[in-house]
């Protein structure tokens, strides 16, 4: 069991919109897709609460990775700062 590999975890890239909480940031992830019926390009965004272990601040572009539940809302953690 110890040599068993962990499955791939989801990763997303977004912008930090809030870093006022202690060790927690809010990351906005934007998704652009074509509407299936009307073929219009739609821009959609979603906010994720992520554990901040790298001390990132507002406006930073970061990569977040899925992890175990850390609190009621946090299921993601900041992996790296993307330039």
Curated annotation (Swiss-Prot):
Leader sequence residues: none
CDD domains named in the record: Ribosomal_uS17
Record's keyword terms, sorted: Ribonucleoprotein, Ribosomal protein, RNA-binding, rRNA-binding
SUPFAM superfamilies (alphabetical): Nucleic acid-binding proteins
GO biological process entries: translation
NCBIfam families: PRK05610.1 (NF004123), uS17_bact (TIGR03635)
Summary of the function given for this chain in its UniProt record: One of the primary rRNA binding proteins, it binds specifically to the 5'-end of 16S ribosomal RNA.
Protein name: Small ribosomal subunit protein uS17
Biological source species: Chlamydia caviae (strain ATCC VR-813 / DSM 19441 / 03DC25 / GPIC) (Chlamydophila caviae)
């Amino acid at each position: 069991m110890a040599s068993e590999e962990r499955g791939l975890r989801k990763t997303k890239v977004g912008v930090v919109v809030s870093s006022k909480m202690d060790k927690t940031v809010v990351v906005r992830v934007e998704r652009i897709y074509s509407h299936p019926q009307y073929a219009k390009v739609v821009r959609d965004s979603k906010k994720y609460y992520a554990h901040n272990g790298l001390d990132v601040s507002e406006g930073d572009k970061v990569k977040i990775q899925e992890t175990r539940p850390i609190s009621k809302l946090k299921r993601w953690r900041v992996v790296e700062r993307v330039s």
